[in-house]
Every structure is written in C-alpha cells, then in structure tokens.
A protein has these predicted regions:
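A mature extracytoplasmic/lumenal domain signature
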Residues: 79, 114-118, 152-153
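Ser/Thr/Pro/Gly-rich low-complexity linker/stalk segments immediately outside membranes or between
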Residues: 21-37
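Short beta-strand edge/turn micro-motifs at domain boundaries
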Residues: 111, 132-155
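Core segments of small alpha/beta cavity-forming domains
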Residues: 32-92
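Amphipathic, hydrophobic N-terminal targeting peptides for secretion and organelle import
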Residues: 1-26
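A short, acidic/glycine-rich surface segment
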Residues: 47, 120-125
C-alpha cells in the first residue's frame, strides 16, 4: 500500500514538475517574442524619424530594410519623393525612442506603442524645440526577424 501511495505521489510530482517546466518555457518564449516586437518597432520608428539630407538615400534604404508588407509597398512607392523632399528642405532630424510597449500580440504579429522625441537641426534657426510624438507600429515576424508592417501616428 505504501509503495502504491509512493508511486502515485511520484507520478503527481513528475506531472507537476513537467507542467511547471512547460509553463516556464512558454513564458520565456512569450517574453522573447515581446522583446523582439518592441525592439523591431523601436528601431523602425527611429529609422523612420531620423533623416539627414546628406544621406537621404541610405536613410530611405534603412527604412525599407526594416519594413515588410503594406508599409514596405507604400514606402517603396514614395521612396524617391522622400529622398527629394529631404534634400530640397535640407532636413536633419534625429528621432529618439523614449519609451515603447507591446499593446497586443496575435501569433506572429504585434502592435507596439512607441513614444519618440524628434530634434531637428536648422542652421538658420538658433533654437528649435523638440517634437514629441506617439506612433503605433505593427510588426510582423517572419522566421527569426521582425519588421515593420504598418505605422500610424497617434494624436
């Protein structure tokens, strides 16, 4: 009788340890995916809001390299006007991510709210106040890489 009780307790403990191990593994995977989404969205926002007219071609390519889906298609069509406008206006903007957090996750897609500060340099003006924006960035994971698939400025 004691042997049967010992076996039952042993099986229950093994089941509990297995379940706890699985839950820890699942939590680790969710944290890894959350970090991947937040990092990709933050980098995508910084890429989008950092432009130097002297390197506008490289800046536009950097945006495309971190994009996928409809955002990639849309920016690809507007890439040349983005470059031309940056050069014409002699834009020098530096976007810095001040905070970011995952709003929702659905499979291989996540939506991240990103707060950014954008500072501009204009030699004609002595002092320029930074601009503060919030951007909702949708990120799509393909394989081990996550890229920006949509960007919406939040009022």
């Amino acid at each position: 009788m004691a042997l049967v009780a010992g076996l039952i307790v042993g099986v229950m403990l093994a089941g509990l340890v297995g379940w706890l191990g699985f839950r820890a593994y699942e939590a680790h995977n969710l944290d890894t995916q959350r970090n991947l989404f937040v990092h990709a969205a933050s980098q995508g926002a910084a890429n989008l809001l950092t432009v130097d007219y002297q390197h506008a071609d490289a800046d536009a390519q950097r945006i495309l390299n971190s994009a996928t889906g409809k955002f990639y298609d849309s920016f690809s069509r507007r890439k040349q006007s983005y470059i031309d406008n940056a050069k014409r206006t002699r834009s020098q903007l530096v976007g810095t991510v001040t905070d970011a957090g995952l709003e929702t996750r659905n499979g291989n897609q996540g939506r991240v709210l990103v707060a950014v500060t954008v500072k501009s340099s204009d030699p004609a003006q002595t002092h320029q106040e930074p601009h503060f924006w919030r951007i909702r960035v949708t990120v799509q994971k393909t394989g081990d890489v996550a890229k920006v698939s949509d960007v919406v400025f939040v009022p």
